[in-house]
């Protein structure tokens, strides 16, 4: 598998790509996940305050205990899902219990893993344990 465009960017270009993705993800979460909006509003952080990956440290941390409480108060995801529940492919539960929604295409996730392995220098015939 050949490397994608992102894997061949300069460090500056890659950081700019990451920063754009971070801005987009935070903006989307703020406008579509009530729990994210509430947590950000509570600490006075708006999406415009998050311009780079380094700015993520401004966001409040959600502890496991807080997540469990939020999921009990607003089942099953505690206000953290940003897409319609009908678009979820599966829901995993972990001990705790914590519900983890999954929406993406498993083949797209596999392609990301393959690209990572290619970037690390693995090729056809290599054995990975």
What are these regions (language model features)?
Residues 1-125:
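Nucleotide 5′-phosphate-binding alpha/beta core
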């Amino acid at each position: 598998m050949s490397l994608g465009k992102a894997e061949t960017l300069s460090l500056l270009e890659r950081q700019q790509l990451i920063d754009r993705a971070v801005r987009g993800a935070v903006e989307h979460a703020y406008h579509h996940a009530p729990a994210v909006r509430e947590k950000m509003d509570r600490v006075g952080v708006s999406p415009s305050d998050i311009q780079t990956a380094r700015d993520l440290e401004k966001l409040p941390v959600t502890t496991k205990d807080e997540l469990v409480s939020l999921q009990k108060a607003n089942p099953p995801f505690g206000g953290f899902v940003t897409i319609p529940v009908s678009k979820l492919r599966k829901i995993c539960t972990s001990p705790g219990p914590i519900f983890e929604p999954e929406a993406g295409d498993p083949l797209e996730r596999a392609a990301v893993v393959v690209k990572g392995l290619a970037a690390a220098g693995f090729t056809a015939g290599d054995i990975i344990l």
